[in-house]
Amino acid sequence: MFKTFYDNNDAITATGLCQIQDTRYLVQNPPNLPLSQKELDEIHDLTYERDVHPYYRTGGPTKAIETIRFSIASHRGCYGECNFCSIAVHQGRNVVSRSESSILKEALAITKLVGFRGYISDVGGPTANMYMIECEQKKEKGSCKNKRCLYPKACENLPLNHGPQIELLNKIAGIEGVKKVFVASGIRYDMVMEDKKRGLKYLENIVKNHISGQMKIAPEHATPQVLKAMGKPGTEYLKKFKNEFNKLNNNETDEYSRQYLTYYIIAAHPGCTFKDMLDLKEFARKELKITPEQVQVFTPLPSTYSALMYHTGIESFTGKEIFVEKDPIKRDSQKAVILGRDHYRRPTKHDYGDKKRLRR
């Protein structure tokens, strides 16, 4: 049933879904078609306040607004299709990019805003480096039913070319009043490594000009069975990307400041055992030479394959049973494997209620 729902969220091929409920039918209409580039440009050309609603100002400063006040959305949609992420359902698997002229117009407008000090905090989207990279076949016929764009590796029909984003960032940086343009959105390192023509040039440009000390990437895990359950690529791409990143950071010229990789990790995802977290810690120590700090305990989000696996204990694509850690203390313990013993916590009455242990 879930696969029927998920496949039916492609706007180009979707039809109405009907489910009988008592004497009536529940009807889910197909999603709207993706916005055209012209429509997306028109939406972003509107004069937004770039501030919190006046109602919330009475409660004092809102710190979160400062991270996005001077940022630019370059595109929407994501074809990464990580099993734990609902963006593919919310925004669609078709990436729609704004025109260069629209983005440059917004960047120029930002320079005129009160409080702007020359720094554009982010130019990106759900995945920063999907800008202007989309499959022409998918635009016409919709997403493939039994094939993903990036998993287990990039599809040959995906025209990987980071050139347009390189040019865009350079042009924004050249606008009078702009001191620095940052890319703070996450980057798919597998796309960088699969772009044989401009991938390394893109990485060099980002490291040299567009990150403020840390580049965010999301390997999420390292063991094959957990990565498979997540719909994430293997560690080969990660190791190659890290090596290229390190080469740039070992450059002794003044062009490069010392930069670091920030790794996002998920603990207690369906299929992940305590031993898997120990293996991940060892991988991070030996291969990444770091202890990741951005670790979160898996949260099952609606409309995702990972939530389906969490609640059913069944691997979504094979129908086989899969281990799911539901004990709240043990879930936190998986996170603590990476972060250290200070992050272990004692159980509270809210964890178990009247039960001694939650049942799987």
Language-model features: locations:
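Flexible, acidic/Gly-rich N-terminal and inter-domain linker regions that tether
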Residues: 1-68, 349, 355, 359
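Conserved, mostly hydrophobic/aromatic
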Residues: 43, 78, 82, 103, ...
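Radical SAM enzyme [4Fe-4S]-AdoMet core and its adjacent flexible, acidic
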Residues: 43, 134-163, 229-230, 234-236, ...
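Structured C-terminal cap/extension of enzyme domains
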Residues: 97-98, 344-355
